[in-house]
């Protein structure tokens, strides 16, 4: 009366296997977002949308870019574990970026405009008269391009444009 066992359902075609890759992303691409063609370890190339604000250790999932299904189902996904490369110019602090910028003594004393490098390109930065080494100047909206975007904080480092300047030496000795 109750025998015969349970019927097995045919699960249908199975999805292909997911494939994991580790990828290195340029600091600028992680900050501003980008679309890049990346070569994978197996020789394949994938077009990847890199979202602004991505950090090392996050995983990007590319649907149907993994192994094909052995039973006619959908292909698996490609899982890209991200490693954001360090920048020689900027460091990241959440949504904000930080950098040091050399400013000549004349500009620091009298004030002026200098060029500051941002991940999206160079911008003009106003240096107020009397700026000291270590002063922090803010470039609003020039940090990680999230909503709202972060800021770029520039730490001023005063440098002598000509350390053998006789006028500067005489001024210093006259004190």
Which role fits each region the language model picked out?
Residues 49-175:
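Intrinsically disordered, low-complexity linker/assembly segments
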Residues 8-10, 43, 86:
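Short acidic (Asp/Glu) patches
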Residues 25, 42-46, 121-123:
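Short acidic/polar mixed-charge low-complexity motifs
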Residues 39-41, 117:
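A generic structural motif
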Residues 1-38, 70-73, 79:
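Post-J-domain flank of DnaJ/Hsp40 co-chaperones
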């Amino acid at each position: 009366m109750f025998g015969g066992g349970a019927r097995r359902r045919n699960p249908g075609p199975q999805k292909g296997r997911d494939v994991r890759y580790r990828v290195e992303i340029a600091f600028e691409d992680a900050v501003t977002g980008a679309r890049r063609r990346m070569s994978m370890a197996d020789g394949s190339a994938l077009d990847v949308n890199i979202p602004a604000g991505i950090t090392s250790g996050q995983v990007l999932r590319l649907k149907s870019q993994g192994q094909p299904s052995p039973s006619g189902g959908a292909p698996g996904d490609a899982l890209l574990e991200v490693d954001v490369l360090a920048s020689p110019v900027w460091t990241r602090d959440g949504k904000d970026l930080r950098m040091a910028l050399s400013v000549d003594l004349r500009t620091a004393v009298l004030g002026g405009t200098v060029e500051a490098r941002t991940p999206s390109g160079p911008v003009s930065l106003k240096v107020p008269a009397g700026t000291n080494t270590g002063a922090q100047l803010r470039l609003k909206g020039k940090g990680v391009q999230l909503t709202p975007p972060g800021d770029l904080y520039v730490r001023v480092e005063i440098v002598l444009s000509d350390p053998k300047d006789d006028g500067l030496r005489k001024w210093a000795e006259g004190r």
